[in-house]
Amino acid sequence: MKTYKEYIQDADEKGNAIGHFNISNLETLHAIYNVAKKLSVPIIIGLTEREEAFVGRDEAVALIKTLRTRDNYPIFLNADHHYSFEAVKMSLDAGFDSAVIDLVKLPLEENIKITKQCVEYARELSKKENREILIEAELGFIGTSSKILDKIPDGVGEVTMTTPEDAKHFVEATGIDLLAPSIGNVHGMFKTGNPRLHPERVKAIREATGIPLVLHGGSGSMDEDFVSCIKAGIDIVHINTEI
């Protein structure tokens, strides 16, 4: 079986993206996994801090490892939206394949410092346990909800989108493997319709950073927006609310 990073590279070269789906129960896991197998595509299962606490950190690792080993199938486990080094460390120590460190509410330099700490720890653990571990970080405001909302949250707009310059600085300063930028996407779904995505910003950020990009807040977005952003450099798409 190829590595996590190799599957991401394959998706990039083919102009595709890997689906990342959050779960909070066994039924959802099996539904997502069975569809992935039917389509013969790799899959990423995500657990936020709250979902991880509900499902169980060790239980989630055991479930994913069992499916991957038993079926020899590319299914990976991601610690989605973790808000401290300590939270990331606990997930990686338990056996998660990757983690998203989300510190967008902190000043940029403090964000960089803690994100770099996560990257360095992941590298050390990867060598110690001889397994691949990826670190992703979010940059720019994307909102925080996983619900159906009446309107787009205040503060979300073009002015809060990630710039190529900030993305380049952040990636070079931290050494992250994956970046989740703000490109018009917002977590959650909206009764008024989701905002449009900006593939031109995706392209500019990808060219500036040279690393795979991740689209968060995919629930409710239009198919044509997905396709345009994937062609521009998105390699992973997150879906949660819509499930």
Where are these predicted regions, by residue range?
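Alpha/beta enzyme core
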Residues: 3-14, 24-51, 58-76, 82-211, ...
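Glycine-rich beta-strand-to-loop/alpha-helix junction loops that act as flexible
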Residues: 216-219
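A C-terminal functional module that forms or caps the active site or interfaces directly
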Residues: 241-243
